């Protein structure tokens, strides 16, 4: 059985290499997928317009999936305009064009922002899972924002029980352990050392069946491998809600 990679950032045309960023084209990614036995990769979107980084917008990802539907599907994204009333219609258009989810959602607003809650409400109605990147603070790094202990995420999980939330990034996975830091710099780092029972991520997984995990990148990798015994138990317990993925190659 072929596997699915749930988190890729690709381009349609070649992108010049830089010292800090390498973006593969969808054709360049195929050997990697084949080597790992991956039948289909799901593309993350940077938004409705072309992002400052050379990663696929909704339009570009739709174009890639149309060019090679055997190997690629795509998630859509929205640009923040602060108007919740437009969200459902904009996401409906994306779904009509073939989007299978929303991601990577990285609007740098708190999770209780009305626009974001409109996204989550529409996602549940349209059956579009949401992959989010989390930041520790508005104006710091990128991603949706929550406080230490993830109280806003829990409120979203309660408020939108029919929406599937896929957690991703350092600020989410650092909460695997009960001794998760509270300062913004440390919350944006990979976790390390033995996991102390009572972490918020395991607690939220236990309480809310609509929470899922995106295991791409070192953020999730460290969360699982920092304490092998705990990580293996977590993988086994939530095997049907954890998704292996690449992020960028």
Which role fits each region the language model picked out?
Residues 7, 33, 94, 102, ...:
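Conserved, mostly hydrophobic/aromatic
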Residues 15, 112, 223-225:
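Active-site-adjacent loop/helix micro-motif of nuclease/hydrolase catalytic cores
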Residues 1-59:
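An N-terminally biased module of ancient metal coordination in phosphate/nucleic-acid-related enzymes
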Residues 3-6, 42-45, 75-77, 103, ...:
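Active-site neighborhood of phospho(di)ester-bond hydrolases with catalytic His/Asp-centered motifs
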Residues 33, 65-69, 95, 157-158, ...:
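N-terminal cationic-hydrophobic initiation segments that often serve targeting/anchoring roles
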Residues 52-148:
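Active-site gating/metal-coordination segments in enzymes
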Residues 10, 47-48, 80, 108, ...:
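Active-site-proximal loop/turn and secondary-structure-junction residues that shape catalytic pockets
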Residues 100-101, 116-244:
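Catalytic pocket-lining loop regions of alpha/beta-barrel enzymes
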